Each structure stands twice: as C-alpha cells, then as structure tokens.
Design a protein with these regions (language model features):
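Canonical tetratricopeptide repeat
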Residues: 215, 249, 282-283, 314, ...
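A structural "domain/chain start" motif
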Residues: 14-63, 71-72, 76, 175, ...
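Catalytic-center loop of serine/cysteine hydrolases
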Residues: 52-56, 69-187
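Structural signature of tandem alpha-helical TPR/SEL1-like repeats
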Residues: 190-198, 222-235, 256-269, 289-300, ...
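TPR alpha-solenoid repeat register
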Residues: 212, 246, 279-280, 311, ...
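Residue-level recognition of tetratricopeptide repeat
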Residues: 209, 243, 276-277, 308, ...
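Alpha-helical segment of the N-proximal tetratricopeptide repeat
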Residues: 176-211, 215-224, 373-374, 397-424
C-alpha cells in the first residue's frame, strides 16, 4: 500500500507537466527523421527508421527520447502536417513544445552497397550544435549502422557513459533489415489494411521482433480483433514501459474475449511492477467476472485515485453484491458527487434507496484509457523512486541490488540495459563478484572475447563461481584451447556438481576431442 500511494502521488504530480520531464530533466531528447540524401525514393523509409532505432537505444541507455507519437502530436498542435520537414528554427519550436532538452538531426547517403549516416545534437537551452558524428556500413547491416551511431551520440550526450559499442550493436543483432523495413512501413502507412500487411510480414520474417509485435497488437486491438491482439501483446519482450503497456492491453483484450482468468493474470503481472488504479481496477473486474469477491482490489484502486469516479462506482457495486448495503450506498453517493448526471447511477440509487430489486444487476466498469504516454510517465516515476532508494543503500548493497536487476535484464536478452546496470554496480563497488561475472556474460554475448575473459578472471579473483568458470570454458572451447576448457568446466562442476551447463560443455569437449561420451 505504501508503494501504491507513492506511485500514485508521483504520477499525479507528474501529470501537471510533460510526462518525461518529471524525472528526465536534461535527458529528454527529440530525435527527428533523417534527411534522405541518397536520391533513391525506395530508401525513403530509412527517413523514419533512423529515429526509431536511435530512440530505442537511447532509451535503453537511460535517456528519455520522445516517441514518434509525441512528435506527431506536437506537429498537429503547431498546425503542421505529419510529413513536415522542420528547419532548425521550427525544430526548436517543436522541441520547446515538447519540453525537450536536445534535438538530434541527421541524414543518410549511400555509395554502392554501403550507407553512411551522420547526426548532430542541438542543445535547446544553449542553442548550440555539436560536432557531426558518423557511422558507416553495408546497407544490409542498416540496423547495426544506426546502433553504432546511437552509441556515438550517447557518448556525445554523456562523455562518462561506459557501455561498450559492441553492446549497442548486439542490441539490434536479431533484427534483419527486411523485417525492419516492413515494420517501418507498417507504422507509417496511412491505410490500416496496408499497415497490417506490413506488420504481419515483419513478424513473419522475424518472430522475435518485439516492436513489430507491439505495433501489430495495437492495430488488432484498434480493430477489435481481441484474440489476435492478446496473442500479439504476449509476444512483446521490450523494455519495461513497453512490456507493462503490452501486459495491460493484453489484459483488456482477454477481458473483451471472455478469458477472465487469463485477464486476471495479465493485470496481476503489471500490478506487481505498476500498482496504479487502472491496473488494479481491471484486475478486480477480471476477478469479479469469474464470480469471485474483488472488493479488496476495488478498494485499493479507489485509494490510489480517490478522484476517479468509476472506482467509487465499482466499489459500490461490489459492496452491494457482497452484502454491505451501507458501504455501497456511501460509495455510490461519492460517485454521484463526481458524476451527478449519470443515469445508470441515478437508477441504482433510486432502487437501493427503495430497497427494491433491480431488473439488471450493474457490472463494474473497465478502465480503458491508460495510454502509452501514461505508461512511460509511470515507468519514469518508478525509476525515480528506485534511484532514490538505491542512493540510500550502502555501496555493497547498491552493487548487489543493481546486479540482481541487471541479471533479470540479461535473462530477457536486453544486453544494453543489463550492461548499463552492471557498470553502475561496479562503480558502486568494484569488488562485486556478481557484477564482474554478469558483465563477463554480457561481453561474451556481444562477441567481445577479450573483455569477457578479463571480467570473468576479475570475478574469479574476487570469488570463485561456476558461472565465471563456464564463461572461460566456452571462450577456450571456441578458441580450440581444449585442455584449458576442460579445466575450466571441471572447476565449474566442482563448485556446482548439478550444473547442467558444465556437463553440456564437458560433453561437447569430449566430442571435439574424439573421446567417448560419458
């Protein structure tokens, strides 16, 4: 309940200003579409691809880039068309409308099969433009080129940022350019049928493409294709704001499909991270639709947002259904103060006052209006609370907490987010074995073998662990250093006799050496 109240208060305070401004002061970015200088209309889609990649990587790096939706909203607010190409002066006006601290502008050109992207940062308060940064590569490695550019921009924005460039590139390694092109066309196409066609092609080409699944799920949901939407939302494995939003709307899609038990689970998963009134309310509705008593959750939703009229209405209905007539009357009276002209509530009040049975029992109301901006705002507020909590811990406790959080990101394949937290853990306590060991795994996954070996050895110096020995074993096996790999895997098995990973490595080594498998 303390967390619930704290989040509610922070979000209520943040609602008085720009959603990101509450916690991202100095780090709010507006990434504009890049100029197409290729002379090829077929490559115009990269115009929107650039801000999409850069915004995702900058968000993972701890900045608060404004979304494409934010940008389109600001253009509309200024009376400008969606395809408007702003000058530097109009870019500043756009940024000021969105309270952005910096603007990123850029362009791209091709030469043969290669692409070069360049970008600059405009400081809104100082009206200064940075030096140009560039990234080049093969056109079929387009995502990697923009990942590299994102890393260079991050270093310009924060020279102390120490996540490796390889980690940025690895973050987009599973997205091929064909799927990415279909995704970009799917979010920019004005016709819904065409948007669906492109997005379906994107996820067919890459079944692990979370951003494409999210966009497809939104289209299905908007088209009231709730079963398809629920399935698509379940595929989203992005950052916290995206996964929370996906969980919430998956819950709604399941509610509207009559899958009340699954809807309850979806909302409960979101509520564990984000216990806000709309989430708690809908979890309670899903429970109630199964014939169970959800009064306690309805009460929590009302406590989180006392000015939300429907939360009083829902609590009144639940109390009445479960025999608390006086409590129901009191909650209905609170609702009527907020919405005195509601005809359904007026009929309920008349029937309840006359103690007569209503012909149709009212149903609790579903909260539908929690949008992407609200989720980003709430996630930023939670990050702010977490930063305050971490600052109060001792260096050792802070390193342990950050390493645990980083491990969770690593388990989801979010390498950039994971490395950022491991680096923070090492900054808090450079003798944290867990942080060095986790960073070794990140380095291994990004292909930085020297860095992985260095971190694994640092971890072993601090405290021997099976995980660190296994990193060395896999590196040695890949380098055909089979004796060393056998030794490392054997040491891992001594520390953890039940380690399946160590046994697998030993079996692979046995096969490579031509010996019979044990």
């Amino acid at each position: 309940m303390v967390l619930l109240a704290a989040v509610a208060l922070l979000v209520a305070a943040g609602a008085q200003e720009n959603p990101e401004a509450a916690a991202g002061r100095g780090r709010i970015l507006l990434v504009l579409p890049f100029d197409n200088r290729t002379g090829q209309p077929s490559l115009e889609w990269i115009h929107e691809a650039a801000p999409e990649v850069l915004s995702h990587r900058l968000s993972s790096a701890g900045f608060a880039p404004l979304s494409r939706g934010d940008r389109l909203y600001a253009l509309d607010h200024l009376g400008l068309p969606q395809g408007f190409q702003p000058s530097h002066a109009s870019s500043l006006k756009l940024a000021q409308t969105l309270d952005a601290d910096s603007i990123i502008v850029g362009s791209y050109r091709t030469e043969g099969t290669r692409i070069e992207a360049q970008a600059q940062i405009i400081s809104v308060p100082r009206l200064q433009m940075s030096q140009e940064v560039t990234a080049t590569g093969e056109l079929h490695n387009l995502v990697a080129v923009f990942d590299s550019l994102a890393w260079k921009l991050t270093r310009e924005l924060d020279p102390a940022f120490n996540v490796a460039e390889e980690t940025f590139v690895a973050a987009g390694a599973n997205v091929n350019v064909e799927a990415f092109e279909q995704y970009i066309r799917g979010i920019t196409e004005p016709d819904q049928a065409e948007r669906l066609r492109h997005l379906q092609a994107a996820v067919k080409l890459n079944s692990e493409f979370s951003e494409a699944w999210m966009a497809l799920a939104r289209e299905d949901y908007a088209g009231q294709q709730y079963e398809q939407a629920a399935a698509a939302f379940a595929k989203v494995k992005g950052n916290d704001a995206d996964s929370l939003e996906a969980g919430f709307y998956r819950g709604l899609a399941l509610l509207f499909s009559g899958e009340y038990g699954k809807a309850e689970g979806a909302f409960a998963g979101v509520a564990r991270m984000l216990p806000l009134a709309p989430v708690l309310n809908n979890q309670a509705v899903a429970i109630s639709r199964q014939g169970h008593d959800a009064t306690a959750l309805f009460r929590q939703a009302e406590s989180a947002d006392p000015n939300g009229a429907d939360y009083h209405f829902n609590l009144a209905v639940s109390l009445k259904r479960h025999g608390d007539a006086a409590g129901a009357q009191a909650e209905l009276a609170q609702y009527m103060k907020l919405k005195p002209s509601d005809s359904e509530a007026q009929e309920m009040q008349t029937a309840w006052n006359a103690a007569s049975a209503s012909s149709v029992e009212p149903l609790e109301r579903i909260e539908r209006g929690f949008d992407a901006v609200a989720f980003r705002q709430a996630a930023v507020m939670l990050d702010q609370m977490e930063a305050t909590r971490l600052a109060a811990l001792s260096p050792d406790q802070r390193a342990q907490t950050l390493s645990t959080q980083a491990r969770e990101y690593l388990s989801r394949g979010l390498l950039l987010e994971s490395e950022r937290l491991y680096q923070q853990a090492i900054a808090a306590n450079d003798r944290s074995e867990a942080a060095h060991q986790g960073l070794a795994e990140v380095r291994e996954r990004t292909g930085d073998t020297a860095g992985a070996r260095k971190e694994a050895q640092a971890a072993l110096t601090l405290q021997p662990s099976a995980e660190s020995y296994l990193v060395l074993a896999r590196l040695d096996m890949a380098a055909k250093q089979l004796d060393d790999a056998n030794h490392d895997a054997g040491e891992a098995l001594k520390l953890d006799p039940n380690s399946r990973a160590a046994k697998d490595v030993l079996r692979q080594l046995s096969a490579m050496q031509g010996a019979p498998k044990q």
